[in-house]
From Swiss-Prot, chain A:
One GO MF term: zinc ion binding
UniProt record, GO biological process: chromatin organization; mRNA export from nucleus; positive regulation of DNA-templated transcription; protein transport; regulation of transcription by RNA polymerase II
Residue numbers bearing the Phosphoserine modification: 167
Similarity remark: Belongs to the SGF11 family.
Function: Component of the transcription regulatory histone acetylation (HAT) complex SAGA, a multiprotein complex that activates transcription by remodeling chromatin and mediating histone acetylation and deubiquitination. Within the SAGA complex, participates in a subcomplex that specifically deubiquitinates histone H2B. The SAGA complex is recruited to specific gene promoters by activators, where it is required for transcription. Required for nuclear receptor-mediated transactivation. Binds independently on SAGA to promoters in an RNA-dependent manner.
Cross-referenced Pfam families: Sgf11
GO cellular component terms listed in the entry, alphabetical order: cytoplasm; DUBm complex; nuclear pore; nucleoplasm; SAGA complex
Record gene name: Sgf11
Protein name as it appears in the record: SAGA-associated factor 11 homolog
From Swiss-Prot, chain B:
Gene assigned in the entry: e(y)2
Species of the source: Drosophila ananassae
Subunit structure: Component of the nuclear pore complex (NPC)-associated AMEX complex (anchoring and mRNA export complex), composed of at least e(y)2 and xmas-2. Component of the SAGA transcription coactivator-HAT complexes, at least composed of Ada2b, e(y)2, Pcaf/Gcn5, Taf10 and Nipped-A/Trrap. Within the SAGA complex, e(y)2, Sgf11, and not/nonstop form an additional subcomplex of SAGA called the DUB module (deubiquitination module). Component of the THO complex, composed of at least e(y)2, HPR1, THO2, THOC5, THOC6 and THOC7. Interacts with e(y)1. Interacts with su(Hw) (via zinc fingers).
Predominant localisation class: nucleus
GO BP: heterochromatin boundary formation; mRNA export from nucleus; poly(A)+ mRNA export from nucleus; positive regulation of transcription by RNA polymerase II; protein transport; transcription elongation by RNA polymerase II
Protein name per the record: Enhancer of yellow 2 transcription factor
Family (UniProt): Belongs to the ENY2 family.
Length: 191, 100
């Protein structure tokens, strides 16, 4: 076998050179100035390697057409998510809108959800309409007005009830509280 | 034997090169340098247009100086210290091995 001696020879040579390298390196390290140089050189080389890696990555992406794919299609501004305070993601105000409708019959503001039942009663449709009942009672038994008022929901109380149809719950509450306060005050006065 | 040659050969021989390289890559990724350079490459590619005449070599010559300055000082200092300790560490190891 002619290859074995040469292989052995090269192996010997390798060990010799590696020992040489170590020795060279040791000599180099002993001098602080050349150590600095070596450190800086190492840093520069490895940094350049890293940069080259990024370049090749970018180049590969560009050649394969993935770079433009990564950029993607520009988004339409109308569908962009809005990040303003007090606005939802579509850029619409989050504040509650007044959902009141004006009743065409009595020109009163009525909450949208209650508009249909209000209109029904206001225009006097349906069986349970208090207005129709009151009208009937008023025409047929005009003398028994006292009975009507004692009946509660009929007649003159109708308009007062309609105030509750509007969406302003605050008004309701405030009126209730004022009533309570009034009663308390009255109580205080009496005691 | 030049400094660069010796250092190259020795670090490859002892396996320190890959160690230092891993450390460097990790630090640079952590501090966002990688993304910055990537962005730089992209903007330059966009500026140069769609023509295929722009080569990797051209890109390297253009961006490498900028990429070097982009490295944060803290990272640079840390890496230089690490490289120094690793190199000197080996020297003491060699001495320790030779002493007995």
């Amino acid at each position: 076998m002619p290859t074995t001696p040469s292989a052995q020879g090269s192996g010997n040579q390798n060990t010799a050179t590696s020992q040489q390298i170590v020795n060279n390196f040791r000599e180099l390290i002993k001098d602080p100035k050349s150590l600095d140089e070596a450190v800086n050189y190492m840093y520069q080389t490895l940094l350049d390697d890293a940069v080259a890696g990024i370049f090749i990555e970018t180049h590969h992406l560009r050649k394969t057409g993935n770079l433009s794919a990564l950029d993607g299609v520009a988004e339409d501004s109308t569908y962009r998510i809005c990040e303003m305070p007090n606005l939802d993601i579509f850029g619409i105000s989050t504040a509650k809108k007044p959902m009141d409708c004006t009743c065409p019959n009595c020109d009163r503001l009525v909450a949208a959800a209650r508009f249909a039942p209000h209109l029904e009663k206001c225009m006097g449709m349906g069986r349970i309409s208090s207005r129709i009942a009151s009208r009937r009672l008023a025409t047929k038994e005009g003398s028994s007005a006292a009975l009507l008022h004692s009946g509660g929901n009929a007649g003159g109380t109708d308009d007062e009830d309609d105030v509750d149809w509007s969406s302003d719950k605050r008004k309701k509450k405030s009126s209730q509280s004022s009533r309570n306060n009034g009663s308390k005050k009255n109580n205080g006065k009496t005691f | 034997m030049t400094v660069s040659n010796t250092v190259d050969q020795y670090t490859v021989l002892s396996g320190d090169r890959s160690k230092i390289k891993d450390l460097l890559c990790n630090r640079l990724t952590e501090c966002g340098w990688r993304d910055e350079v990537r962005l730089l490459c992209r903007t330059i590619l966009l500026e140069k247009g769609t023509g295929n005449s722009f080569t990797v070599e051209q890109l390297i010559t253009e961006v490498t100086p900028k990429a070097r300055t982009l490295v944060p000082d803290a990272v640079k200092k840390e890496l230089l210290m690490k490289i120094r300790t690793i190199l000197t560490e080996n020297e003491s190891e060699i001495e320790d091995a030779e002493e007995p």
